[in-house]
Amino acid sequence: MQSYADTTLPAMGEGAEMTTAEERRLGEDIAREIFRDPQFLEDPILYEYVNSIWQELMAAARQRGTLTAELQERFAWQVMLIQDATVNAFALPGGFMGVQTGLVAVVTSRDELASVLAHEMSHITQRHIARMLAQQKRMSPVMIAGMILGALAASKNPAAAQALMIGGSAAVIQTQLNFSRDMEREADRTGMGLMQPAGYSQAGFVSMFEKLQQANRMNDNGSWPYLRSHPLTTERIADMQSRLPNNAARQPQDTGMVAQMMSARAKILSKPEPTVLQQWAQWVQTPEFAQQTAEQRSGALYLAAMANHQLGRTAPAQAALDQLDTLVQAKPQAVRQAQLLRADLALTARTPDAALTALAAVVPTAQKSFASQTTTISSATTGLVSEAVISRGADNSLSISDADRDAPLLPPAQPAASTKGQAQDRTQLILLAQALAQLPTAQLAQQSSLLRSASNGLQTVVAQTPKDAAAWQALSSIFRVQGQPLRAIRAEAEARAAQYDYAAAVDRLRAGQDMARHSKERNDYYEASIIDTRLREMQALAKEQAARK
């Protein structure tokens, strides 16, 4: 195990050599490369689960004062999922957070996952990254970005890391990027303080530490890189144990069905070997399965359904889904996840009718969105929408019809925090868009109501969270099936911009300009004017980004 070197922390003021704006730009450059990586995972179901924990911890950090209003505004606070079986999570400059599927796969409760995210969030709120990078005084931002990307690659593939490293060996650079013991202790204590206000048990911190310690005792085969960047010490573990409330006996945690189901999903998304899939598919038929708790059985059935589906075994997959439905029927959130799984597997099998049926059974919040033909947003969002297309209702709220709605002209620096209901709507809307895009053209005319609802709902999502690339991409697919190619192109451009690929955004906007010149549609005039404005903005951002290379 790589040891830590004791270092003296610079005073907070000394970290000012890297301003919040500089750190944000550095983070964006790193995030852009991660978004381009084939291992970047766009899975709305797992993302909703991880991001919901992240948002609850952010709310707790604001409440406790560890996340200031300035830092919340200036940093991105974006979670990125990485499709990798190794157990890792990492905070990046500028408020970006990477979570690998291997980590979600090994935790057994929301509390354990929250403990890791709270720790990493505290590295960000305490400006540990800026303070650490301030010590690399002779290095340019490009070199620092290369160091960080190289260190991330080293956790997965040392050979690939060498191609990214700048200015030294992988081992030396990894040492430079590790947080000091004092920083780790501060992140532990600050992170643990977020748990209870966010609705999580502080015992999750200790159980996660014990899980990491157990892995640390074993011969490390490289599957737990989190241990190398965050080495455990007896002192750290004892400190966390001593901070548990006296009245909090070490009782078995209520792991919860949803946590088990999301752990199962992460296992499948980590791309296991076919032999492993076969073991998971068959385990629900063993006597040991019947002896598990209801929570554990829900995860095993979810796992078996996905494993059988990937192995092409339709009947066993359906049987596992049916068993899962029976098991979770008294747990509303677990019922919702079971229906989302049905929709997801139907989409993978390219049976959109089955996906639509499953989505129609999902509901609480999203049904209202699907049923409405007009979306009303508060006057607080007026600056995000083109003045030319807004009409005011009698109650002075802003109502934007499907025919005239336009997306943000000037997206804010970071996405607004979504409520739980809005996050759930997002998941269902993205899956709905995928299902509608798979329908044969002849069937689309029968789904005009759903198309309008999906369009309205997704436009609300991107108005609230302009950096949501997946929502923009889903909206683009809806615009295409609605016969609005110009709007589809602009939504594609916004998706690229949301992933900080401004050059690609410029390319799509230019294509939109060319299309607009040849269009005779009246409504395209408004869209063309927005494209012109966004193109100028993207060109400026692309130029600035290129200058940093």
Language model: regions and residue ranges:
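Acidic/histidine metal-binding catalytic segments
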Residues: 46, 133-145, 160-163, 199-209
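TPR/TPR-like alpha-solenoid repeats
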Residues: 97, 106, 124, 247, ...
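Active-site His/Glu-centered metal-binding helix of metallohydrolases
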Residues: 30, 117-126, 190
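Catalytic Zn2+-binding segment of zinc metalloproteases
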Residues: 108-112, 121-138
